């Protein structure tokens, strides 16, 4: 669809569009980013995810050129831009506030960057209208920002950013101001637009659902360092430590003691006084402490009689109906509370558990994630 679809056609094959090497940054003597290394590939949707204060926005601002790294190097398409000012980098940013000029029309907002670059007048109108068509707002060209909805303003901000043909588009928590329904819609539209444009998107958020639903790849940060780098599925299903596991969705953490090894893939452990088999290939010996992690949707509840003692036993203490799912809290005999999420089937008489009911908590072998015992996470 015209020029905008080929925005990213000139690049070095096989090399990352952005490479951060040994990046460090401190504010007022406090280290915010410490020796960070990161490659960002051409045409990917990368999300930098982490809690407030983890340094994710600082990384974005250093890529954009709004902050200068104290140490390290930033390469953009194999060119060193560490000391290059923001306006000379082929990188554009969509801010949380969108930063639209209220006195300008939509057309003039999108055209602003082109005029600043002294693009010939004959090129400006077709490029602006192409960008507006790309975000499906060409008919809004003569309106002012206050006449647009939040979602429309967000799309105009994106059109203004992509019309300059950036190599990379940076988005700083740019969906957080939208209501839930609109945010879900924009997640889908952003990913679709990114595929259509072929531009590398780097998206910063603290919202795990946004990261999982939009990204090709997720970087999870804590205290200025990368905790895990992987696909959404890898981050969710195979967290490398307790911080990542707990930050990405709900997780149940069982304390386990090693009994013995069964084969090269499986070991026998004691969980809540019950002998269980889990998958764990690292070296381990009898008595070693481990942590067995299971998502609520990976657990099952089996109703048992009060006289029965099978599986990890507990009593249902709370239930929450969420339409498609029924979430139950089970208090185990040790006092630990476990969250279980089951698909709600109104025709299944056993799914709607009673408060106080005795149940056994089970799971399918190999669905668990097993980690070395972390005292601090």
UniProtKB/Swiss-Prot annotation:
Residues noted as binding ATP in the record, renumbered to the chain: 50-57
Q: Does the keyword Cell membrane apply?
A: yes
Q: Where does this protein reside within or beyond the cell?
A: Cell inner membrane
Specify the protein's topology with respect to the membrane.
Peripheral membrane protein
Q: Which reaction does it catalyse?
A: ATP + H2O + polyamine-[polyamine-binding protein]Side 1 = ADP + phosphate + polyamineSide 2 + [polyamine-binding protein]Side 1
Q: Which SUPFAM superfamilies match?
A: MOP-like, P-loop containing nucleoside triphosphate hydrolases
Ranges where the ABC transporter domain occurs: 18-248
| Entry keywords, A to Z | ATP-binding, Cell inner membrane, Cell membrane, Membrane, Nucleotide-binding, Translocase, Transport
* GO cellular component entries: ATP-binding cassette (ABC) transporter complex
Q: What is its EC number?
A: 7.6.2.11
Among the Pfam families in the record, one is TOBE_2
Q: Write down the top EC class of this protein.
A: translocase
Principal localisation: membrane
Q: What terms describe the molecular function in GO for this protein?
A: ABC-type putrescine transporter activity; ATP binding; ATP hydrolysis activity
Self-association and partners = The complex is composed of two ATP-binding proteins (PotA), two transmembrane proteins (PotB and PotC) and a solute-binding protein (PotD).
Q: Which family does it belong to?
A: Belongs to the ABC transporter superfamily. Spermidine/putrescine importer (TC 3.A.1.11.1) family.
The record's function comment reads: Part of the ABC transporter complex PotABCD involved in spermidine/putrescine import. Responsible for energy coupling to the transport system.
User: Which PANTHER family has this protein been placed in?
Assistant: SPERMIDINE/PUTRESCINE IMPORT ATP-BINDING PROTEIN POTA, SPERMIDINE_PUTRESCINE IMPORT ATP-BINDING PROTEIN POTA
Q: What is this protein called?
A: Spermidine/putrescine import ATP-binding protein PotA
Q: Could you tell me which species this protein originates from?
A: Vibrio cholerae serotype O1 (strain ATCC 39315 / El Tor Inaba N16961)
Gene assigned in the entry: potA
